[in-house]
């Protein structure tokens, strides 16, 4: 199973439309995305309590299965699970049996034998979380924490939550995504979410070497010139150069990229005065964005990090709720 196979919604949704896995935003409608945002909103205040816990996943075991490293994403998933009162296991892939030749399927079988309830999966191979969702026994939820170039649905949703907090709506908004779109799973999920939630225009601004061939099919307009692309923007999302995924010379130099596509105060001044600046992190200062902008009054980058915990709490609690509802359905059907 790969990311190019038919809609995964037979996997990620129950028969009555609840989440049971969270693999991709493809095929999910506005009501469900709005429900995720609303649920996350309700969890924001948990982080402001003296005791930052709710009992929704008490007695459940969540396994963070990260085949790619990511300090920020893994940390926020771990915090989200713990704030839901789950037990959390962080699997170190570099020392696990998988690194010693054990197959992914065997690793999963062993983890399931330990009565795990949820796997949070980050993998360099597109479609890996989908494959895992097909392989696990019923009742185990899979959350995609980023797979190859395919998708990063929780990052996109925390970005949508941040936009809604600061703009109050999606209708009428003009949003640009700037930088290395070619290698970005985040950009693909962001474009999908923005279109479903009703943004007026989604632009991508990048050199042709950093754009996928089918970029316009994703639901966006393309601009190669930063000055033109910044005009009338409500939101600008900067992406880092993913040099670890680049094959060959796609750029003359980082300095040249920054000159043409890096966000500084002068370029930000071409957007609307209340344009907000976002970045999924990690930030390469002086490559895609200057410090004065990243740390400036229009930056909401740290809000994104805070919202990551709330969004992941929402998705994890909703997916586990869907699994539990489906389990009850199976039990009732078995007694019928």
From Swiss-Prot:
<feature type="binding site">
    <location>
        <position position="100"/>
    </location>
    <ligand>
        <name>L-aspartate</name>
    </ligand>
</feature>
<dbReference type="InterPro" id="IPR036901">
    <property type="entry name" value="Asp/Orn_carbamoylTrfase_sf"/>
</dbReference>
<feature type="binding site">
    <location>
        <position position="72"/>
    </location>
    <ligand>
        <name>carbamoyl phosphate</name>
    </ligand>
</feature>
<protein>
    <recommendedName>
        <fullName>Aspartate carbamoyltransferase catalytic subunit</fullName>
        <ecNumber>2.1.3.2</ecNumber>
    </recommendedName>
</protein>
<dbReference type="GO" id="GO:0044205">
    <property type="term" value="P:'de novo' UMP biosynthetic process"/>
</dbReference>
<keyword id="KW-0665">Pyrimidine biosynthesis</keyword>
<comment type="similarity">
    <text>Belongs to the aspartate/ornithine carbamoyltransferase superfamily. ATCase family.</text>
</comment>
<feature type="binding site">
    <location>
        <position position="155"/>
    </location>
    <ligand>
        <name>carbamoyl phosphate</name>
    </ligand>
</feature>
<feature type="binding site">
    <location>
        <position position="152"/>
    </location>
    <ligand>
        <name>carbamoyl phosphate</name>
    </ligand>
</feature>
<keyword id="KW-0808">Transferase</keyword>
<dbReference type="GO" id="GO:0006520">
    <property type="term" value="P:amino acid metabolic process"/>
</dbReference>
<dbReference type="Pfam" id="PF00185">
    <property type="entry name" value="OTCace"/>
</dbReference>
<comment type="subunit">
    <text>Heterododecamer (2C3:3R2) of six catalytic PyrB chains organized as two trimers (C3), and six regulatory PyrI chains organized as three dimers (R2).</text>
</comment>
<feature type="binding site">
    <location>
        <position position="281"/>
    </location>
    <ligand>
        <name>carbamoyl phosphate</name>
    </ligand>
</feature>
<dbReference type="Pfam" id="PF02729">
    <property type="entry name" value="OTCace_N"/>
</dbReference>
<dbReference type="InterPro" id="IPR006131">
    <property type="entry name" value="Asp_carbamoyltransf_Asp/Orn-bd"/>
</dbReference>
<feature type="binding site">
    <location>
        <position position="240"/>
    </location>
    <ligand>
        <name>L-aspartate</name>
    </ligand>
</feature>
<feature type="binding site">
    <location>
        <position position="122"/>
    </location>
    <ligand>
        <name>carbamoyl phosphate</name>
    </ligand>
</feature>
<comment type="function">
    <text>Catalyzes the condensation of carbamoyl phosphate and aspartate to form carbamoyl aspartate and inorganic phosphate, the committed step in the de novo pyrimidine nucleotide biosynthesis pathway.</text>
</comment>
<dbReference type="GO" id="GO:0016597">
    <property type="term" value="F:amino acid binding"/>
</dbReference>
<dbReference type="GO" id="GO:0005829">
    <property type="term" value="C:cytosol"/>
</dbReference>
<dbReference type="InterPro" id="IPR006130">
    <property type="entry name" value="Asp/Orn_carbamoylTrfase"/>
</dbReference>
<feature type="binding site">
    <location>
        <position position="73"/>
    </location>
    <ligand>
        <name>carbamoyl phosphate</name>
    </ligand>
</feature>
<dbReference type="InterPro" id="IPR002082">
    <property type="entry name" value="Asp_carbamoyltransf"/>
</dbReference>
<dbReference type="GO" id="GO:0004070">
    <property type="term" value="F:aspartate carbamoyltransferase activity"/>
</dbReference>
<feature type="binding site">
    <location>
        <position position="282"/>
    </location>
    <ligand>
        <name>carbamoyl phosphate</name>
    </ligand>
</feature>
<feature type="binding site">
    <location>
        <position position="185"/>
    </location>
    <ligand>
        <name>L-aspartate</name>
    </ligand>
</feature>
<dbReference type="InterPro" id="IPR006132">
    <property type="entry name" value="Asp/Orn_carbamoyltranf_P-bd"/>
</dbReference>
<comment type="pathway">
    <text>Pyrimidine metabolism; UMP biosynthesis via de novo pathway; (S)-dihydroorotate from bicarbonate: step 2/3.</text>
</comment>
<dbReference type="GO" id="GO:0006207">
    <property type="term" value="P:'de novo' pyrimidine nucleobase biosynthetic process"/>
</dbReference>
């Amino acid at each position: 199973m790969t990311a190019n196979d038919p809609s995964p919604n037979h996997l990620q949704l129950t028969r009555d439309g609840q989440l049971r896995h969270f693999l991709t935003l493809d095929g999910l409608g506005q009501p469900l995305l709005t429900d995720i945002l609303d649920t996350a909103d309700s969890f924001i205040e948990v982080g402001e309590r003296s005791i930052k816990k709710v009992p929704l996943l008490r007695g459940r075991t969540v396994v963070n299965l990260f085949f790619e490293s990511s300090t920020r994403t893994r940390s926020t998933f771990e915090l989200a699970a713990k704030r839901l009162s789950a037990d959390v296991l962080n699997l170190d892939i570099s020392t696990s049996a998988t690194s010693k030749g054990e197959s992914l399927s065997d690793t999963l079988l062993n983890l399931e034998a330990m009565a795990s309830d949820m796997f949070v999966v980050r993998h360099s191979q597109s479609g890996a979380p989908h494959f895992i969702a097909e392989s696990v026994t019923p009742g185990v939820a899979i959350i995609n924490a980023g797979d190859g170039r395919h998708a990063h649905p929780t990052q996109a949703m925390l970005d949508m939550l941040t936009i809604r907090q600061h703009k109050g709506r999606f209708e009428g908004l003009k949003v640009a995504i700037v930088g290395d779109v070619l290698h970005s799973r985040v950009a693909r999920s962001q474009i999908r979410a923005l279109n479903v939630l009703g943004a007026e225009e989604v632009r991508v601004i990048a050199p042709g070497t950093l754009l996928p061939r089918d970029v316009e099919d994703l639901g966006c307009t393309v601009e190669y010139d930063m000055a033109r692309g910044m005009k009338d923007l409500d939101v600008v999302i900067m992406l880092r150069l993913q040099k670890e995924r680049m094959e060959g010379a796609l750029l003359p130099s980082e300095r040249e990229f920054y000159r043409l596509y890096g966000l500084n105060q002068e370029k930000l001044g071409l957007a609307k005065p209340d344009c907000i600046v976002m970045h999924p992190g990690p930030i390469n200062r002086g490559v895609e964005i200057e410090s004065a902008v990243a740390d400036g009054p229009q930056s909401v980058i740290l809000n994104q990090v805070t919202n990551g915990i709330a969004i992941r709490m929402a998705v994890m609690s909703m997916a586990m709720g869907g699994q539990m509802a489906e389990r009850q359905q199976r039990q009732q059907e078995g007694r019928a």
